[in-house]
Amino acid sequence: MYIKRHLETTIEKLSGCCKVLLVTGPRQVGKTTLLRRLAEGNRTYVTMDDINVRSLAMTEPGLFLQRYKPPLLIDEIQMAPKLLPYIKMYVDEHGNNGDFWLTGSHAFDLMENVTESLAGRIAIVHLLGFSHAEVAGLGAGAFVPEEKFLLQRAQEAEILPMRDLFEQIWRGSMPALNNASEQDWNNYYSSYVQTFLQRDVRTLTQVNDELQFYRFLCAAASYTGSMINYAALAKEAEITAPTAKQWLKVLAAAGLVYLLEPFMHPNLKYGVKAPKVYFTDTGLAAYLLRWSNAEILEAGAMSSSFLETWAVMEIYKSFSNCGQIPPLGYYRDFNSREVELVLNVDGSIHPLAIRKSSSPVKEIKKFDILRPVTEGERALKLGAGGVICFANDLLPIDARNWYIPAGLL
């Protein structure tokens, strides 16, 4: 059964006003399936995985565009970068919006080539795995914890018990694993990691020892939901700190991790500056850390980190699926007081705590560390916030903050 992706509306809108559309994202998140469904047979499909097609695109790009005429869907465009300047010449000559739909992995070289060749002509959107809202059939929309949005979401969403939510967290967001068995889960991620090591890692960086990079990948998974410490990560992976920093950028370029930068403001003078790292798919992180089922993960030492990772990525997807750059940050001061998520939207900041509890009553007191941003020339409003938790219902904490059941994300 096809599950409607929230990015569909954004793609149709952008395709109507831009000559080229690029959908990026990690392997196997459904980029091709999404675009082929939207095309409905009305555009030619070619994939650069086909060596004959790729050879033509790389050796005779002009002839390629004579053979495959727009409207055209080109899969894995990063494998044929020489085609991009010819796409530019074609769209400049013909000027039709939506002539080219492209998919590609979110890699350094791809984005650099696209930016150079198609600047001003291309719209770029990013697709990750299924969101909870997509699987549950909820409406699309950027998650901002304001009363109208929360009340609407509470009417359409179910309150998930902790066990059910951790089943979703453990299973992950890959479309191929929707309703899969535990054995399928293990086999899938084993193959996924092997493919990533053999194909993507070699493309993105010079790594001679796949086993060493695998150790790094597992070590990085242990940091999901945590502020990154490159020296400690490097020691655990038995590499140097500069290498750890570079390899983490590789994971980010491949779309496997998201680096959440600290929220910065001139009035906040004592905040840490290191990013936090989140695996974009909690199932992959669980596999790398050998959490063999949801029950063990829920009871394990990293359950809170996995809940935070899941919540942050759900909110991230809610923005990116609307075609917006997610306005996310976090704030932690030198006294270790932390607001897990700060949304900076339309001149207001929305603080969010994330807790594996049903009624974490003291969490909103930490939001006071953000009050200095409401003063001075660059003042921001302190907007609605809340605690994402396992409350039995959407409930107000005070005039501005809410207990937000995790199932409403």
Spell out what each predicted region is.
Residues 103-107, 113, 128-130, 388-392:
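A short beta-strand-to-loop transition that corresponds to the Sensor-1 phosphate-sensing loop
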Residues 84-108, 115-117:
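Conserved catalytic/switch belt of AAA+ P-loop NTPases
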Residues 108-124, 136-141:
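Short regulatory helix/loop adjacent to the ATP-binding pocket of P-loop NTPases
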Residues 67-83:
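Conserved P-loop NTPase "ATPase switch" module shared by AAA+ and STAND
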Residues 132-133, 137-314, 320, 324-326:
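Interdomain hinge/linker elements that couple catalytic modules in large macromolecular machines
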Residues 54-72:
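Conserved alpha-helical scaffold flanking the Walker A/P-loop in AAA+ ATPase domains
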Residues 1-28, 32-48, 68-70, 249-250, ...:
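A cross-kingdom feature that marks ATP-driven nucleic-acid transaction machinery
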